Amino acid sequence: MAKGLDCGTSYYITATEDSIKKQRNVFLTVDGDANQVKRMLKRQRIPFVEKAGKVHIVGQHAFNYAQIFSTTELKRPMSQGLLNPKEKDALPVLNAIIGELLGKAKGKETCVYCIPAKPIDQTREVSYHEDVLKQIIETYGYDVKV
Protein backbone atom coordinates (compact mmCIF):
# COMPACT_ATOMS: atom_id res chain seq x y z
CA MET A 1 0.00 0.00 0.00
CA ALA A 2 1.32 3.46 -0.89
CA LYS A 3 1.33 6.42 1.48
CA GLY A 4 1.26 10.13 0.78
CA LEU A 5 3.02 12.70 2.95
CA ASP A 6 2.24 16.41 2.87
CA CYS A 7 5.04 18.31 4.61
CA GLY A 8 3.42 21.58 5.57
CA THR A 9 4.70 24.37 7.77
CA SER A 10 1.85 23.92 10.28
CA TYR A 11 0.97 20.22 9.92
CA TYR A 12 2.43 17.06 8.46
CA ILE A 13 -0.31 14.84 7.04
CA THR A 14 -0.15 11.24 5.84
CA ALA A 15 -2.80 9.53 3.78
CA THR A 16 -3.45 5.98 2.65
CA GLU A 17 -6.41 4.51 0.81
CA ASP A 18 -8.38 4.22 4.03
CA SER A 19 -6.91 6.64 6.57
CA ILE A 20 -5.56 10.13 7.18
CA LYS A 21 -3.27 11.09 10.07
CA LYS A 22 -1.89 14.49 10.95
CA GLN A 23 0.67 15.87 13.36
CA ARG A 24 1.47 19.45 14.27
CA ASN A 25 4.82 20.56 12.93
CA VAL A 26 6.05 22.12 16.19
CA PHE A 27 8.31 21.34 19.11
CA LEU A 28 8.88 22.60 22.62
CA THR A 29 12.18 22.53 24.50
CA VAL A 30 11.77 21.40 28.10
CA ASP A 31 14.13 22.82 30.71
CA GLY A 32 15.27 20.77 33.68
CA ASP A 33 17.08 17.51 34.32
CA ALA A 34 17.01 15.65 30.99
CA ASN A 35 16.83 12.18 32.57
CA GLN A 36 13.94 13.13 34.82
CA VAL A 37 12.08 14.82 31.96
CA LYS A 38 12.57 11.77 29.70
CA ARG A 39 11.27 9.39 32.39
CA MET A 40 8.16 11.50 32.85
CA LEU A 41 7.51 11.77 29.10
CA LYS A 42 8.03 8.02 28.57
CA ARG A 43 5.56 7.21 31.36
CA GLN A 44 2.97 9.41 29.69
CA ARG A 45 3.86 8.12 26.19
CA ILE A 46 4.60 11.61 24.93
CA PRO A 47 6.85 11.71 21.85
CA PHE A 48 10.12 13.55 22.36
CA VAL A 49 13.59 13.99 20.90
CA GLU A 50 16.80 14.39 22.85
CA LYS A 51 19.59 16.36 21.21
CA ALA A 52 22.72 17.76 22.87
CA GLY A 53 21.34 17.23 26.37
CA LYS A 54 18.06 19.02 25.61
CA VAL A 55 14.67 17.34 25.49
CA HIS A 56 12.13 18.48 22.90
CA ILE A 57 8.45 17.48 23.01
CA VAL A 58 7.17 17.15 19.44
CA GLY A 59 3.85 17.54 17.66
CA GLN A 60 0.43 18.02 19.22
CA HIS A 61 1.75 17.32 22.73
CA ALA A 62 4.15 20.27 22.38
CA PHE A 63 1.23 22.49 21.38
CA ASN A 64 -0.82 21.29 24.36
CA TYR A 65 1.99 21.94 26.84
CA ALA A 66 2.57 25.40 25.39
CA GLN A 67 -1.10 26.22 25.99
CA ILE A 68 -0.76 25.22 29.65
CA PHE A 69 2.51 27.07 30.25
CA SER A 70 1.83 30.34 28.45
CA THR A 71 5.40 31.61 28.91
CA THR A 72 6.75 28.70 26.88
CA GLU A 73 7.72 29.30 23.27
CA LEU A 74 6.75 26.86 20.54
CA LYS A 75 9.34 26.36 17.82
CA ARG A 76 8.89 25.28 14.21
CA PRO A 77 11.28 22.98 12.37
CA MET A 78 10.03 24.54 9.11
CA SER A 79 9.60 28.11 7.97
CA GLN A 80 7.93 29.35 4.78
CA GLY A 81 7.49 25.78 3.56
CA LEU A 82 11.17 24.80 3.92
CA LEU A 83 13.48 23.60 6.67
CA ASN A 84 13.99 26.34 9.23
CA PRO A 85 17.66 27.42 9.05
CA LYS A 86 17.37 29.09 12.47
CA GLU A 87 16.47 25.85 14.29
CA LYS A 88 19.52 23.65 14.77
CA ASP A 89 17.39 20.80 16.16
CA ALA A 90 14.94 20.80 13.24
CA LEU A 91 16.18 17.57 11.64
CA PRO A 92 15.73 15.20 14.61
CA VAL A 93 12.34 16.77 15.30
CA LEU A 94 11.20 16.23 11.70
CA ASN A 95 12.53 12.68 11.86
CA ALA A 96 10.38 12.01 14.94
CA ILE A 97 7.26 13.56 13.40
CA ILE A 98 7.66 11.68 10.11
CA GLY A 99 8.43 8.41 11.91
CA GLU A 100 5.35 8.73 14.09
CA LEU A 101 3.11 9.33 11.07
CA LEU A 102 4.57 6.83 8.60
CA GLY A 103 5.91 4.06 10.81
CA LYS A 104 8.19 1.41 9.29
CA ALA A 105 7.44 0.33 5.73
CA LYS A 106 5.79 -3.05 5.33
CA GLY A 107 7.61 -4.78 2.51
CA LYS A 108 8.20 -2.68 -0.60
CA GLU A 109 5.95 0.25 0.30
CA THR A 110 6.08 3.56 -1.54
CA CYS A 111 5.79 6.99 0.04
CA VAL A 112 5.03 9.96 -2.19
CA TYR A 113 5.74 13.36 -0.64
CA CYS A 114 5.40 16.93 -1.82
CA ILE A 115 7.68 19.94 -1.67
CA PRO A 116 7.05 23.58 -2.50
CA ALA A 117 7.94 24.91 -5.93
CA LYS A 118 10.99 27.14 -6.23
CA PRO A 119 9.71 30.71 -5.85
CA ILE A 120 10.36 33.10 -8.71
CA ASP A 121 10.68 36.18 -6.50
CA GLN A 122 13.04 34.82 -3.81
CA THR A 123 16.37 33.06 -3.68
CA ARG A 124 15.28 30.04 -1.65
CA GLU A 125 16.68 26.66 -2.55
CA VAL A 126 14.27 23.73 -2.32
CA SER A 127 16.65 20.95 -3.41
CA TYR A 128 18.28 20.66 0.05
CA HIS A 129 14.81 20.45 1.64
CA GLU A 130 13.80 17.78 -0.88
CA ASP A 131 16.95 15.71 -0.24
CA VAL A 132 16.63 15.87 3.55
CA LEU A 133 13.00 14.75 3.51
CA LYS A 134 13.82 11.95 1.08
CA GLN A 135 16.63 10.72 3.31
CA ILE A 136 14.43 10.77 6.43
CA ILE A 137 11.61 8.85 4.71
CA GLU A 138 14.05 6.28 3.30
CA THR A 139 15.33 5.50 6.81
CA TYR A 140 11.88 4.06 7.53
CA GLY A 141 12.23 1.65 4.59
CA TYR A 142 10.07 3.37 1.98
CA ASP A 143 10.63 3.65 -1.75
CA VAL A 144 10.41 7.44 -2.06
CA LYS A 145 8.87 9.53 -4.83
CA VAL A 146 8.46 13.33 -4.97
Report the location of each language-model feature.
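Nucleotide/phosphate-binding catalytic cleft detector across ATP-hydrolyzing
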Residues: 1-55, 60-146
